[in-house]
From Swiss-Prot:
One of its GO terms (cellular component) is excinuclease repair complex. This is UvrABC system protein C. PANTHER family: UVRABC SYSTEM PROTEIN C, UVRC/OXIDOREDUCTASE. Residues 20-97 form the GIY-YIG domain. GO terms for molecular function: DNA binding; excinuclease ABC activity. Its main location: cytoplasm. GO terms for biological process: nucleotide-excision repair; SOS response. Belongs to the UvrC family.
C-alpha cells in the first residue's frame, strides 16, 4: 500500500475541512492500528497544535507514525470526553495515557433469595440481586473478611446444590464456621437474626450491634443459659478485634481517597477505599504512556478510565486539582448512570490527613516500582546486546509445551515487559492431532486454526494426541500466534524465546518465512545432563553458546523459561484432570450428555457428584436407584 502523505503533511491536509466544533479525533498507523485518541473543544484549533514547531519527542514520534486521521463531531465537551474514554478503553492506543491491570474490585455479597442466606465473594461492576458490601481492594481483603465473618457469625458459604444435597453436617460445622442450617441445626428465626447482625457489622453499625449483643448476653445469663451467653460474649470480643484490625474512620463514610505522585516522568496513583467508615484496602496504579504529561492530565485520564470499571462512591477525594473537573464529573455520572458525585481537594482537617497518608503510600509504591523498572531495564539492555537486537526489548514472549507421550498436549506463551511478567497477556494453545494441522496448512487457512484453537487463559477442551511430536506442537502454536499478530501488529514482540534446541530453531524459521515476518527469536535448551545453569542458546547464523550461570542476565533468562515451563505444566494438568473426570462419567452405561449435565447441575461440581451417596444420586432427575448404584460404583472403584 502506497500512502500519498503522512505525518504533519497529512494533518495539514485535514485542517482544510476540520470543523471548529467539539469532537474526538483518532490517529492511525500504516496498519490502521489506533495510535492515539484525543478530544477537543475545537477540533480545528486542536489539530493545528500538531503542526507547530515546539512539540515534545513523544508527540513528534506519534505524528511521524500517523498515516490516517479521522474525527467525529460531538454535541458537547462532555460527549467528547465520554466518546474519548470509550475509544481509549476499546483500542488501548499506544500513545494515550493508559490505566492497565484495572480489574473490577471484589465485593462481599449476602444473598437474600434463600431462607438461609449465603455469604460469598462477588466480582463485577453490575450488582445483581442481594446485599453488597465493599468494594475491597483485593481478593485477599475479601477472603480475610469472609473468614472472620464465618468465625463470628457462622453463616453458610456453600452453593444451593451443595446445601440441598446434605444429609449430615459438613466440615465447616465441625470447625465451628457454620451452624449447619442444611440439616436443621439452626432454625430460620435464629439464622435471620444472625443475618441482621452481619448487615449491621458490614454497614458500620458496630456500636449498636455490640450494645444489642451485650443486652442479649445479660438476658441469657439471667435465664441461666450460660453456654449461649458465653457464645455471645466471644462474638463481642471477636467483633472488637476485627474492628480494631480493620481500621475505622470517623472522617469519611463512603469515599475513595486518591493521590497522584510523579518522579522522573513516571506516575503512581494510589487509591484507598473506605466503605461504611471502614478501610477496605488500598492499591497502587502505574499509568503508561505518561511521557511529557502533567499531573492534571494523568489524573483526569485515570479517573475517567478507573470509574468505567469501578463502583463510584459518594465522595472522591483527590490530592491534586484537575483542569476539566466539571466535565469529568458529568462524564463519570453518565458512564455510571448516577445523579450525584462529589470530587474535592481538601486543604486541611481529617480529609487532608487521609489524602496525605495516601500520598505517602503512593511515593513509597512509586519508589519500589522505579527500582524494579531500573533493574529490569539493565537486564533488558544486556539481552539486547547478547542477542544483537536493534533496540531494548519492551515485550518478550516465551514459549513452551507440555504433554504425556503426546496426550493432553498444550502449548503456552508467557509475556515479560518493562517491569516484569504481564500475566493478562499469557495465552494457552490447545494442540491438536497432526492430521488437522496438515489439512489446515494445505488449505492455506491459518485463520481457521486461530479461530478454533487460539484462546486466553483456561482450557476449552482437553487437548489432542500428537504422538509426542514437539516440532509439530511448536509449528501449530507459532502458526496461530503469527496469525493473530497479523491482526495485532501493535503487539509484535521484541524477542521470542522458545524452550528447545537446534531442531526447534528450524521450525521457527520455517513458520516465520511462511508468514514473511522477521521477529528476532532464540531457542534455549537444557545443557549437559539437563542441569540448570548449563543452558545452551541457539540463534540463526551463530554457533551454539552458553553463559556464565552467575550472570544476572542468565538468571533472568532462567526465570523466563521457568515461568513458561510452570505455566505449561499447570495448564496440562488442568486439561488432563478435566479429561479424566469426563471420561469416568463417560464410562457409565446409560449416562449420556443430558444426564451428565443433570448431575453437574444438581450437585454443582464433579467433586460433589463423587461425594454423593447412592440415595443422593437417585434424587437427580432422570437417575433411578439402579443407575445411581452404577454411578456410585464406577466413581468409587479403585484403579
Amino acid at each position: 500500500m502506497t500512502l500519498e502523505i503522512t505525518g504533519s503533511e497529512l494533518i495539514k491536509s485535514k485542517l482544510i475541512d476540520a470543523p471548529e466544533r467539539s469532537g474526538v479525533y483518532r490517529m492511525f498507523d500504516v496498519n490502521k492500528q489506533v495510535l492515539y485518541v484525543g478530544k477537543a473543544k475545537n477540533l480545528k484549533k486542536r489539530l493545528t497544535n500538531y503542526i507547530k514547531s515546539n512539540l515534545d519527542n513523544k508527540t513528534l514520534r506519534m505524528i511521524a507514525n500517523t498515516c490516517f486521521l479521522e474525527y467525529s463531531i460531538t454535541n458537547s465537551e462532555v460527549e467528547a470526553l465520554l466518546l474519548e474514554a470509550q475509544l481509549i478503553k476499546k483500542f488501548q492506543p499506544k500513545f494515550n495515557i493508559l490505566l492497565k491491570d484495572c480489574k473490577s474490585f471484589p465485593f462481599i455479597k449476602l444473598r437474600l433469595d434463600h431462607d438461609f442466606p449465603q455469604l460469598l465473594k462477588y466480582r463485577g461492576k453490575t450488582l445483581s440481586d442481594g446485599k453488597f458490601f465493599g468494594p475491597f481492594a483485593s481478593s485477599a481483603e475479601v477472603n480475610t473478611t469472609l473468614t472472620e465473618l464465618q468465625k463470628i457469625f457462622k453463616l453458610r458459604s456453600c452453593t444451593d446444590n451443595y446445601f440441598n444435597s446434605r444429609t449430615r453436617p459438613c466440615l465447616q460445622y465441625e470447625i465451628k464456621r457454620c451452624y449447619a442450617p442444611c440439616v436443621g441445626k439452626i432454625n430460620k428465626e435464629d439464622y435471620r437474626d444472625l443475618v441482621t447482625q452481619v448487615k449491621d457489622f458490614l454497614q458500620g453499625r458496630t456500636k449498636e450491634l455490640q450494645e444489642n449483643l451485650s443486652r442479649k448476653m445479660e438476658e441469657l445469663s439471667s435465664q441461666m443459659r450460660f453456654e449461649e451467653a458465653a457464645e455471645i460474649r466471644d462474638r463481642i470480643k471477636a467483633l472488637s478485634y476485627v474492628q480494631l484490625k480493620a481500621g475505622v474512620s470517623d472522617v469519611v463514610k463512603d469515599a475513595d481517597i486518591i493521590a497522584i505522585v510523579e518522579k522522573n516522568g513516571h506516575y503512581c496513583v494510589e487509591v484507598f477505599l473506605y466503605r461504611a467508615g471502614q478501610a477496605c484496602g488500598n492499591i497502587p496504579y502505574f499509568p503508561t504512556s505518561t511521557e511529557n504529561s502533567t499531573k492534571e492530565e494523568v489524573l483526569e485520564y485515570f479517573l475517567l478510565q478507573f470509574y468505567q470499571k469501578q463502583h463510584v462512591p459518594a465522595a472522591i477525594i483527590i490530592n491534586h486539582e484537575i483542569n476539566d473537573k466539571e466535565n469529568v464529573i458529568e462524564a463519570i455520572k453518565k458512564i455510571n448512570n448516577i445523579l450525584q458525585i462529589n470530587i474535592t481537594v481538601p486543604n486541611k482537617g481529617g480529609k487532608a490527613k487521609l489524602v496525605q497518608n495516601a500520598e505517602t503510600n503512593a511515593l513509597f509504591s512509586l519508589e519500589q516500582y522505579l527500582k524494579k523498572f531500573a533493574k529490569n531495564q539493565e537486564i533488558m539492555f544486556e539481552i539486547k546486546e547478547l542477542f544483537g537486537l536493534s533496540e531494548i526489548p519492551e515485550r518478550i514472549e516465551i514459549y513452551d509445551n507440555s504433554h504425556i507421550q503426546g496426550k493432553f498436549a498444550v502449548g503456552v506463551m508467557v509475556v515479560a515487559g518493562k517491569v516484569g511478567f504481564d500475566k493478562k497477556e499469557y495465552r494457552v494453545f490447545n494442540v491438536h492431532a497432526p492430521s488437522l494441522v496438515c489439512h489446515s496448512r494445505e488449505s492455506g487457512d491459518p485463520k481457521r486454526l486461530m479461530d478454533s484453537c487460539f484462546r486466553g487463559n483456561g482450557i476449552k477442551n482437553c487437548g489432542g494426541d500428537i504422538k509426542g511430536d514437539d516440532y509439530e506442537m511448536l509449528r501449530q502454536v507459532l502458526t496461530r500466534r503469527l496469525t493473530r499478530l497479523r491482526q495485532e501488529p501493535h503487539k509484535l514482540p521484541s524477542l521470542m524465546i522458545i524452550d528447545g534446541g537446534k531442531g526447534h530453531l528450524g521450525v521457527v524459521k520455517e513458520v516465520m518465512d511462511k508468514f514473511e515476518m522477521n521477529i528476532p527469536f532464540v531457542c534455549m535448551s537444557k545443557g549437559v545432563d539437563r542441569n540448570a545453569g548449563f543452558e545452551q542458546f541457539h540463534v540463526i547464523g551463530k554457533e551454539v553458546f552458553t553463559l556464565d550461570k552467575n550472570l544476572p542476565v542468565m538468571k533472568y533468562l532462567q526465570i523466563l523459561r521457568d515461568e513458561a515451563h510452570n505455566f505449561a505444566i499447570k495448564n496440562h494438568r488442568l486439561g488432563r484432570s478435566r479429561a479424566i473426570k469426563i471420561s469416568r462419567l463417560d464410562d457409565i452405561e446409560g449416562v449420556g450428555e443430558t444426564r451428565k449435565k443433570a448431575l453437574l447441575h444438581y450437585f454443582g461440581s464433579y467433586k460433589a457428584v463423587c461425594d454423593a451417596t447412592i440415595y443422593e444420586l437417585a434424587k437427580v432427575n432422570g437417575i433411578n436407584k439402579l443407575l445411581a448404584e452404577m454411578i456410585f460404583n464406577v466413581l468409587h472403584r479403585k484403579n
